[in-house]
């Protein structure tokens, strides 16, 4: 079972709202997920991003792979640098 951290679309037509979830890679985009670890609202100004950093950090250490978009959001929040430091600067 490959676990991914990815976006789960919610909201109305033309008003997207994304939950950042941990899900099995075989599940559909808006299908079942294991845990919700944050959300992203690209419509609001400024764009709203809420992350549960502890849960995301735990999942990344367990081997969960973020999607490209989620990786970009995590890098902007500084989580990928934190993971890199924890992994290589013991």
Swiss-Prot record:
Q: Name one GO cellular component term.
A: cytoplasm
Per the similarity annotation, which family is this? Belongs to the bacterial ribosomal protein bS16 family.
Which terms are listed as keywords in the entry?
A: Ribonucleoprotein, Ribosomal protein
Family annotation (Pfam families): Ribosomal_S16 (PF00886)
Source organism of the structure = Lactobacillus helveticus (strain DPC 4571)
Which PANTHER family does this entry report, sorted A to Z? Answer: 30S RIBOSOMAL PROTEIN S16, SMALL RIBOSOMAL SUBUNIT PROTEIN BS16M
Q: HAMAP family per the record?
A: Ribosomal_bS16
Q: Which domain of life is it from?
A: Bacteria
Checking Gene3D superfamilies in the record gives: 3.30.1320.10
- Provide the coiled-coil residue spans: none
- Gene Ontology annotations of biological process type: translation
Gene this chain is encoded by: rpsP
GO molecular function terms attached to this record: structural constituent of ribosome
The name this protein goes by in its record: Small ribosomal subunit protein bS16
């Amino acid at each position: 079972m490959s676990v991914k951290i990815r976006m789960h679309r919610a909201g109305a037509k033309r008003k997207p709202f994304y939950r950042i979830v941990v899900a099995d890679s075989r599940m559909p985009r808006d299908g079942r997920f294991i845990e919700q670890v944050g959300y992203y609202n690209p419509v609001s100004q400024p764009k709203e991003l809420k992350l549960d950093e502890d849960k995301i950090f735990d999942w990344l250490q367990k081997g969960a792979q973020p999607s490209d978009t989620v990786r970009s959001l995590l890098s902007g929040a500084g989580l990928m640098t934190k993971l890199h430091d924890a992994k290589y600067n013991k």
